[in-house]
Amino acid sequence: MPRQFPLEKTRNIGIMAHIDAGKTTTTERILFYTGKVHKMGEVHEGTATMDWMEQEQERGITITSAATTCEWKGHRINIIDTPGHVDFTVEVERSLRVLDGAIAVFCAKGGVEPQSETVWRQADKYRVPRIAYVNKMDIMGANFFNVIEMMKERLGANPVAIQVPIGKEDTFRGIVDLLTMKAIIYVDDLGKVSQETDIPEEVKDIAEEYRIKLLEAVAETDEEIMVKYLEGEEITVEELKAAIRKATINMQMTPVLCGSSYRNKGVQPLLDAVVDYLPSPVDIAAVKGFSPDTGEEIERKTSEDEPFCALAFKIMSDPYVGKLTFLRVYSGVLHAGSYVYNSTKNKKERVGRLLHMHANHREDVDAVYAGDICAAIGLSNTTTGDTLCDENHPIVLESMEFPEPVIQVAIEPKTKADQEKMGIALQRLAEEDPTFKVSTNHETGQTLIAGMGELHLEIIVDRMRREFKVEVNVGKPQVAYKETIKKSVKVEGKYIRQSGGRGQYGHVWLELEPLERGAGYEFVNKIVGGVIPKEFIPSVDAGVQEAMQSGVLAGYPVVDVRVTLFDGSYHEVDSSDMAFRIAAAQAFREGMKKADPVLLEPIMKVEVVVPEEYMGDVMGDINSRRGRIEGMELRGNAQVIRAYVPLAEMFGYATDLRSKTQGRGTYTMQFDHYEEVPKNIADKILEMKNK
């Protein structure tokens, strides 16, 4: 089956916004007008097509980015709907990485909200061209021009209106197209019937003013238009469109449109703008990667004639077909049933079926081509961020960076039956989400799950219950402390049992020394002259490591210690591996008590981005959390504060920051190093732990 749509007529776009700007409703309307859905879903009724996980329908927020294909005016548009909540930034990062362009949706009343700033910065990082859509023009307090000002101030963007609204709040009834200088008035409720008329008197002046602003903005980016504009020559609609397209793709401007998706007004012009101004896969630079054999940089152009390469950007478990791997094909062709090479893992895999996804139903295809987004079934070893390619022309594409999880809670199954299912459920969920990690606490045997925030873990537990029918009890969030020593000591350990029959005899002298942070554990054997036979040395090492699993202060793991075995003795008959293990473990515990043991805590590298006016409050708050401020810089028109703060002090920070900055501050944090806990705080922790 040959390609249905030429590459130039393909658009891979994302719809990104702050929570509640009306992003999912906008996607719904797009699917309705492009003929993919026959009845529109409403988010507040819980029937929106893109929100197909049960939790999303209940909470009315989008958690995973569902990928959908639709058609408009002879173009294929692949849409990825992304979540707007800060705990799910991994979903946004991962979809932006594989998109060519995006629609940024803003609420006409709220304008540029905190998550819009975060998402905008992520899109800047991946250089994704955007058009902006000011939604909810029909609500109280809607102000289109105000949003444009906010985009300049808060995002440092260059927004250029290509439409102005006719009426606002409950009188909003249409838009003026500033390219054709015609009005589009909506007649029916579904917005399918619209009339093109002359511009109504009440908006004539503002339309003229913004037409001039549009021409000036375009002239600044295009030499030919500049000349025509200055000489007062006529600039055709076609010339304007071409110049706006070029400036948008080069990230010199962001065209701004308006509408009310819920009232079905302004959605078709938005679709036209996607086709007119956002890039096709041909318009973007060739994708770069490196050769797994030589390490040299290679690139692949977006073309079917190039060797095949694709990036796996999302894994999903589907109740009917099992594991779905979402792929962005950058070059070449992939046929269903063929073999591909996973260059990240150095493994060959067979692709069973290839699907084009609609939000919740799917269509099988024989092949996918450069520029396509699709889902594959049958890739068992592939995980998020892996490169798939032609084995004869291997390439590894730049993977995605995912932050380390920062919060962990203990979970336990409610019943014996839940226990078996829990392991499978956790493995599946960890496969899907690179920011979700599972581990076991060796002392308590508890299962710990770690993620990006409390909502993130809440939803994971919720999904375990619904999708895998596993009920679990959840503990409180906790910090992973460790223990170490501050001075060197020499210590003797003896384990002797000699009361009839075969006895036990182990005797060691150890020296314990502190090492620098992050050095781990070192074992040095200085036995000479065979005072302890060679075969017992590994047992001494094993005994020490066993004792290090649980420190003397509060049972936390011990790190950064060098242990030297320098003397001891043995018995011809009674010495054994077990005896030396026990002697070494006793010696280590004894020695650690004398070596000035201390508690270590994880220190996080925190970056807080806040508008200037909240800076004093936020810095004061960081200091009160035992934070050390490292530096500040201006980014756009926000202040960036960099600091090191103990993880123990960061619980609940998201909520505090939100209230201190009226929701405009955002922060990221990642683990940096371990550091000694101040004595007064260590005493409190030990008191709690040893109760």
UniProtKB/Swiss-Prot annotation:
Top-rank taxon: Bacteria
Task: Kindly list the places in or outside the cell where this protein is found, as annotated in its UniProt entry.
Answer: Cytoplasm
Q: InterPro entries in the record, alphabetically?
A: EFG_II, EFG_III, EFG_III/V, EFG_IV, EFG_V, EFG_V-like, EFTu-like_2, G_TR_CS
User: Mainly resides where?
Assistant: cytoplasm
GO MF assignments: GTP binding; GTPase activity; translation elongation factor activity
What SUPFAM superfamilies does UniProt report for this protein, alphabetically?
A: EF-G C-terminal domain-like (SSF54980), P-loop containing nucleoside triphosphate hydrolases (SSF52540), Ribosomal protein S5 domain 2-like (SSF54211), Translation proteins (SSF50447)
Assigned keywords, A-Z: Cytoplasm, Elongation factor, GTP-binding, Nucleotide-binding, Protein biosynthesis
Q: What Gene Ontology biological process does one annotation of this record name?
A: ribosome disassembly
Please tell me whether the keyword Cytoplasm is annotated for this protein: yes
What cellular-component terms does GO give this entry?
A: cytoplasm
Residue ranges of the tr-type G domain?
A: 8-282
Residues annotated as binding GTP are 17-24, 81-85, 135-138
The record's comment on protein family reads:
Belongs to the TRAFAC class translation factor GTPase superfamily. Classic translation factor GTPase family. EF-G/EF-2 subfamily.
Q: Which NCBIfam families is this protein grouped with?
A: EF-G, PRK12740.1-3, PRK12740.1-5, PRK13351.1-1, small_GTP
What role is this protein assigned? Answer: Catalyzes the GTP-dependent ribosomal translocation step during translation elongation. During this step, the ribosome changes from the pre-translocational (PRE) to the post-translocational (POST) state as the newly formed A-site-bound peptidyl-tRNA and P-site-bound deacylated tRNA move to the P and E sites, respectively. Catalyzes the coordinated movement of the two tRNA molecules, the mRNA and conformational changes in the ribosome.
What is the name of the protein in this document?
Answer: Elongation factor G
